[in-house]
Amino acid sequence: MVGELRYREFRVPLGPGLHAYPDELIRQRVGHDGHPEYQIRWLILRRGDEGDGGSGQVDCKAEHILLWMSKDEIYANCHKMLGEDGQVIGPSQESAGEVGALDKSVLEEMETDVKSLIQRALRQLEECVGTIPPAPLLHTVHVLSAYASIEPLTGVFKDPRVLDLLMHMLSSPDYQIRWSAGRMIQALSSHDAGTRTQILLSLSQQEAIEKHLDFDSRCALLALFAQATLSEHPMSFEGIQLPQVPGRVLFSLVKRYLHVTSLLDQLNDSAAEPGAQNTSAPEELSGERGQLELEFSMAMGTLISELVQAMRWDQASDRPRSSARSPGSIFQPQLADVSPGLPAAQAQPSFRRSRRFRPRSEFASGNTYALYVRDTLQPGMRVRMLDDYEEISAGDEGEFRQSNNGVPPVQVFWESTGRTYWVHWHMLEILGFEEDIEDMVEADEYQGAVASRVLGRALPAWRWRPMTELYAVPYVLPEDEDTEECEHLTLAEWWELLFFIKKLDGPDHQEVLQILQENLDGEILDDEILAELAVPIELAQDLLLTLPQRLNDSALRDLINCHVYKKYGPEALAGNQAYPSLLEAQEDVLLLDAQAQAKDSEDAAKVEAKEPPSQSPNTPLQRLVEGYGPAGKILLDLEQALSSEGTQENKVKPLLLQLQRQPQPFLALMQSLDTPETNRTLHLTVLRILKQLVDFPEALLLPWHEAVDACMACLRSPNTDREVLQELIFFLHRLTSVSRDYAVVLNQLGARDAISKALEKHLGKLELAQELRDMVFKCEKHAHLYRKLITNILGGCIQMVLGQIEDHRRTHQPINIPFFDVFLRYLCQGSSVEVKEDKCWEKVEVSSNPHRASKLTDHNPKTYWESNGSAGSHYITLHMRRGILIRQLTLLVASEDSSYMPARVVVCGGDSTSSLHTELNSVNVMPSASRVILLENLTRFWPIIQIRIKRCQQGGIDTRIRGLEILGPKPTFWPVFREQLCRHTRLFYMVRAQAWSQDMAEDRRSLLHLSSRLNGALRQEQNFADRFLPDDEAAQALGKTCWEALVSPVVQNITSPDEDGISPLGWLLDQYLECQEAVFNPQSRGPAFFSRVRRLTHLLVHVEPCEAPPPVVATPRPKGRNRSHDWSSLATRGLPSSIMRNLTRCWRAVVEKQVNNFLTSSWRDDDFVPRYCEHFNILQNSSSELFGPRAAFLLALQNGCAGALLKLPFLKAAHVSEQFARHIDQQIQGSRIGGAQEMERLAQLQQCLQAVLIFSGLEIATTFEHYYQHYMADRLLGVVSSWLEGAVLEQIGPCFPNRLPQQMLQSLSTSKELQRQFHVYQLQQLDQELLKLEDTEKKIQVGLGASGKEHKSEKEEEAGAAAVVDVAEGEEEEEENEDLYYEGAMPEVSVLVLSRHSWPVASICHTLNPRTCLPSYLRGTLNRYSNFYNKSQSHPALERGSQRRLQWTWLGWAELQFGNQTLHVSTVQMWLLLYLNDLKAVSVESLLAFSGLSADMLNQAIGPLTSSRGPLDLHEQKDIPGGVLKIRDGSKEPRSRWDIVRLIPPQTYLQAEGEDGQNLEKRRNLLNCLIVRILKAHGDEGLHIDQLVCLVLEAWQKGPCPPRGLVSSLGKGSACSSTDVLSCILHLLGKGTLRRHDDRPQVLSYAVPVTVMEPHTESLNPGSSGPNPPLTFHTLQIRSRGVPYASCTATQSFSTFR
């Protein structure tokens, strides 16, 4: 199923070695749909590296996931939560009294004691105000703490007076009282998380609690909070640099966090009330719950806002951000060359660039990009500079000229300088040739024009796909929004705007509410109405004009970065006249006091900026503030106020208030300490100002912690002036004395070591330095507490965000929390940023030639480090930066290095160079590799990593390494958030997939609803990613995890067969195929059914592995405990293969079942082949309809058809193959008709050929080739065009394992060439004879005697026959020339030389004797051809083997002229008709005796001649067997003048069930016997498949089985080839008779006994001499050279026309 079921509990896999296990039901509530929901705690289980089963599993209860589940999901996944009656067991409710063992009366007495002690402590605390606390008070508090540790008394301490007591104690100036308060709080909080949270919440929500708490009291509460949240949100941020946050900011964050968690608990509790279930409309929230949700959203927005400021994420908002996420499906892999959407094109200027080439941002490292540029760049291409390099600036363009092995290696002609300059590969961006760039510019212009037309409109979330990519996204496009809804803000947008309205002070708040009332018909707006208000967009734009003038700086920054402002602010305000001045006001607010700048106009601000300063412009402070404009004047005024005499408070306080609102000048002042040591005067001035500022209470609210690192830089610098250092010590001592929070900050920055080094340098002569060091040292535990707190708060916020995402998935309700997208953007920030190269390591050492070690990291693939030493002693040592976990370590090599290229590399790790004992990986490098991945995703930090080259290619000694690539972890929160997001997503959707799978297992019809279910889930994730996830990597991580957790398990379940062997999806596809006729029938329910099936299958094959194949690299295999995985990318690696494998396997099974049923029922039908082709075409169309044009499913279709064919018995398979060969023959024969019918025939032929292609590689192909060869021979020897034969063979050529039809077609080409050479040979012979005649013209008279021959006489033919009986060589040559001077219409004779090996000849006894059966003028031509062929065969350059001999056959055809008719006849018919030229009649018996033909062959030839269209009549006579043939009298039946009559005997088809098929079966069974016997004789060792084939062929020819007599009885089937043997081997492998060796698949051995149809035969004769020499058969075609007779005589005769 989806996960793993152990002990009746469902375990969800979350990654390698990680499982989630349902542990406890926490609470229950009523969901938005009115059905109960249950919150389950899922524990994270880790499987140990060693051991299996339960012994290797460790339950980490600190790691858990809280998940709300429906009742159906509980039934499917959490059997432990079900009672005996099948109902969900509710959460356990244990009262406090059940826990303790105290008697009720004793408990009541103790409660009375507690109340009296509380009253006494309050009285004693009020009496000792301002004095030392007396001992009785301390004793009372001590007793109260003891009582507080008793759990049954917890309820007494919930008295409000206890909080008053704790508040008084915590605010007491006496340390012992504050310490006692901490003890009491710890005692009360030791019972359970609920009590602890309640106490913390009650204390933290007290008004102005910060004013009553000192450092120790605040730390006590913070420690309690850290203890309370440590086990709740166990999350590690190791490797991420967290900022230094002072205690007061942390305490504020704790208050916000506790308030948010309290409201969240109230929301969950309110949903569990009984009345909530009776709500008539579950989607509509009640007033109380709606108010709670509003308060929670506002509180969560406040927490996110303060957390962003505390983490200083907002300071990075001005940095250039990555491009916006490209539109498209998050469930499909993004192509590398996807062009950005229109918004990106509008935001950035369009550079000239060609889409053909990849930018540098798409590569993981500079080395990889340099290799790409080196391999792609060609001379003449345009390039652009990406970095500043010496004389060339970034952005300069030029033309690439050449490259070499130097440094830098690339020469470019730069347009900016007008000359060439050398740069590095990785600094260039390829633009392409000029024509490519121009095309790109035109495309950019067109895109810009389109963008300009749609500017100001809301662009769609994605673009329509072209028609060639139908179903490219797994969901339908969202429905058009309601016009009325489009005119109003969504609830989330309104609540985000409402958040800023609630931030306003009283008068401003009332003014904004007044604006709302005026635009909403004066409706009275209370909190409940505000929460559900429908605000028009125009009103929201007016509010966005009003709010910036009334918000403080912090809130204004939040407003500018929020979603609603970005969506409706700039676009809506662009046409407003007040907009420019408003923007100026906002910029001024970011620099100066908001209230003051709001009153000043733009001109006043410019005048103020141009006023000359009152002080000398040459002072260091003046020069410092020059770049800050009006904002810098605050620092000058502050210095003047501090240096003036008299009362300074009135002058300094307003300036400090301005700095609190706008701290940039103050931060600049402190950061000036991190300037060069030469600025001594500036440093002293700044330190004097800072030291005086500390004495003002208002100054403590300034962000000192954000710039303390500048003080640390000055403190650590060895060149800092002693006076500056002393002033810095004074300042820091004063700052830490006033607020110990900053001592904690200094401790976190390592100030203790820096102060110790300064004391050591100045010999201890720094005043207050030791005291400052001791103070910093005492805050060590507080620094640890602060780090823990910020981790817990951040982890808690992430968990709450994940909880809101889960609620969004479950309830389909929008997320209405302000700044939710901002928080996710910062968490995902840096998802495309990696620690690269030199940021990972400190130094690189090599075994030899250290002066060339820099070549390993110079990003130049043409340079290299070459070792110098003995083989196997070369190594590269990497000293890693502390805490860096290697994500990928890659070695760059080059195959051109030949023997210098590494062949085996071992990577070791250790804590020092002397302890490199742990082998991390070993890799064998392929000779063709260029990038060798050595390590991936290490989970442990190794200070030292050594790469050892153990062996080189071709036994080389020294090695060459082209470069190193080291990728470290991503130094952002993205890896942590990705892990948590993927875990929660995986758990949620795997639980849901299990529930859906159980539904479909119980009722297959629920499969029809699966597509809508999946569509809803995937569409929701897509919309969430479009709204909240900022970049492609984050969206792809979510999409892949969702797809793997939801779709992959569902596919696995619906494709798994049940007890009957049928899977749910297979049943659905069967129904689809069986009801094809109802697809387009609107009157039936078919279209809706088919639509659902198609939508489901299109959805399931949505993700397809379309990435380019990876380069040829060596794949590392991590070993042992150092094995590591990036489980978050499991969806990428395993998803497409698993889903596609399951779906294709299911489709193959369905096709195999369909085809098998068809073959079983219809294999004997006369129209079997057309119906099969039609069925196959339906299957093909269905595959395209269901799965699109995907090769995997087409292959599954073919494999399914092949599987059905393989199940046929041999004779049935032979019958099927003969039917296909016959059908193809009929279609080719019928294609000669012409016209539309010919096109229809060709279309049917093409359809049949597609179905025949399935035979390729199957055993049936051998049988099919046998029959196709016979029918093709008859066609080639008839009047059929050979081009069609070639086209057919080109398409189904793989179906002929012996390639006999191809050889037959090749022999025709060879015959044509021989015919051309024979024509030249005849001309040469004629030239020689004419030359002789010229020399002997008196002895020979030319042409007169021969002109009297008008017809052939029987005497001449008899004489010629007599001359052949006793023939000598000279006589043969004389006979060869007897028709050279024949003056009649010489027929054209074409001879086809056919190879006996490839052409099927029925029997060699049917041979033609030209001496007896042909007239002299034809006989001489054949004799000359025989002489010509013998001479050509005897030529040493043409034939070096045994000389072939010719044997004439009766095969072939001819054209005869009979009156006005042209007769197309066979060779036998030609002989018969010519034989009747001078005979009135001839008996069939005499013809048989004279020709030596068989009766069947002669009767087959006589049949068409005696038909109604034939020229002969057959007269039956009693005394003459077979009858008498006579020429039909043509006077009775007038004939047309140029009538063409086809009399060639029709095609004779073989029967697979006859003798021919039985011989094929005998041959196959004999081969099976031989294979089994030979493998039995070799035992378990087996034989190599090539050796087995040779032994079988040898046994077939020489013995010991079968006997020669049986082989002869097989006829043509007795021939055996290696292809036949391989076909039988495949058959036996499929039956399980043979098996392959796992380690050596080319070796076969006998597996199990098998029943083989073995004939009862004897062994072959061992002494046989082998087969006869090969014979070559000949077929002649006769064509007339002259013009046919124009007139016919009364007595018609047959003349040879062709």
UniProtKB/Swiss-Prot annotation:
Pathway: Protein modification; protein ubiquitination. There is a cross-link at residue 1576 (Glycyl lysine isopeptide (Lys-Gly) (interchain with G-Cter in NEDD8)). Signal peptide: none annotated. Keywords: Cytoplasm, Cytoskeleton, Disease variant, Dwarfism, Golgi apparatus, Host-virus interaction, Isopeptide bond, Phosphoprotein, Ubl conjugation, Ubl conjugation pathway. GO terms for biological process: epithelial to mesenchymal transition; Golgi organization; microtubule cytoskeleton organization; mitotic cytokinesis; negative regulation of insulin receptor signaling pathway; placenta development; positive regulation of dendrite morphogenesis; protein ubiquitination. GO terms for cellular component: 3M complex; anaphase-promoting complex; centrosome; Cul7-RING ubiquitin ligase complex; cytoplasm; cytosol; Golgi apparatus; perinuclear region of cytoplasm. Highly expressed in fetal kidney and adult skeletal muscle. Also abundant in fetal brain, as well as in adult pancreas, kidney, placenta and heart. Detected in trophoblasts, lymphoblasts, osteoblasts, chondrocytes and skin fibroblasts. It is found in: Cytoplasm; Cytoplasm, Cytoskeleton, Microtubule organizing center, Centrosome; Cytoplasm, Perinuclear region; Golgi apparatus. Changing residue 1464 to P: In 3M1; impairs the ability to interact with RBX1, thus hampers the assembly of polyubiquitin chains. The keyword RNA-binding does not apply. It is linked to 3M syndrome 1: An autosomal recessive disorder characterized by severe pre- and postnatal growth retardation, facial dysmorphism, large head circumference, and normal intelligence and endocrine function. Skeletal changes include long slender tubular bones and tall vertebral bodies. Belongs to the cullin family. The CPH domain is essential for interaction with p53/TP53. Core component of the 3M and Cul7-RING(FBXW8) complexes, which mediate the ubiquitination and subsequent proteasomal degradation of target proteins. Core component of the 3M complex, a complex required to regulate microtubule dynamics and genome integrity. It is unclear how the 3M complex regulates microtubules, it could act by controlling the level of a microtubule stabilizer. The Cul7-RING(FBXW8) complex alone lacks ubiquitination activity and does not promote polyubiquitination and proteasomal degradation of p53/TP53. Component of the 3M complex, composed of core components CUL7, CCDC8 and OBSL1. Component of the Cul7-RING(FBXW8) complex consisting of CUL7, RBX1, SKP1 and FBXW8. Within the Cul7-RING(FBXW8) complex interacts with FBXW8 and RBX1, but not with SKP1. Interacts with CUL1 (via the C-terminal domain); the interaction seems to be mediated by FBXW8; it is likely specific to FBXW8, but not other F-box proteins. (Microbial infection) Interacts with SV40 Large T antigen; this interaction seems to inhibit CUL7. This is Cullin-7.
